[in-house]
């Protein structure tokens, strides 16, 4: 509710200093992690201060277990002091230079090979996030968002299989949202 009354420029001021640290290009990994932890703590505090109820954290997973930008969400998972609820949003499309207006230049191809082995490997990676007490639930089910489910071959079969794996892992049901 508190965010409703902020203008764009006020919101930009609130978040601006957090976005200015160039932690991706830092060579010193320990220093980068320290800075990330500080930023994550500040974002957590600001989110609660301004009435944000949780975060949807982007998750990038490609065939053959290729991931990008995984460390920030893993650090979030490891830091229980960041006490804001979260869910993961699988950005499940081909990675191209779309942000530069060049969606023809493919950086990482997303193929969605429809095998239970690949689905299980992906699920096993996600399981610690699903087990986390901060995971957002809807009607008692763990929320997992998929950006473009229609791109996944045999998506219905995959979702049924993940639900089965979730029950076997003892975490209950999954709530899928697109």
Where are the regions a protein language model picked out?
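Glycan-processing catalytic domains of CAZymes
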Residues: 1-178
């Amino acid at each position: 509710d508190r965010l409703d009354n902020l203008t764009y420029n006020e919101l930009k001021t609130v978040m601006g200093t957090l976005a200015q640290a160039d932690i991706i290009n830092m060579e010193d990994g320990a220093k980068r992690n320290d800075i990330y932890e500080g930023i994550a703590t500040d974002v957590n505090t600001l989110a609660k201060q301004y009435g944000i109820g949780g975060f949807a954290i982007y998750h990038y997973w490609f065939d053959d277990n290729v991931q990008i930008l995984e460390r920030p969400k893993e650090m979030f998972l490891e830091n229980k002091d960041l006490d804001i609820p979260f869910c993961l949003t699988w950005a499940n499309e081909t990675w191209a230079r779309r942000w530069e207006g060049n969606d023809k230049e493919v950086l990482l191809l997303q193929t969605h090979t429809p095998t239970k082995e690949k689905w299980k490997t992906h699920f096993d990676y996600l399981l610690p996030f699903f087990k986390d007490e901060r995971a957002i639930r809807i009607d008692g089910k763990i929320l997992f968002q998929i950006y473009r489910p229609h791109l996944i071959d045999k998506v219905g079969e995959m979702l049924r299989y993940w639900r089965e794996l979730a029950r076997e892992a003892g975490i209950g049901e999954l709530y899928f949202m697109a």
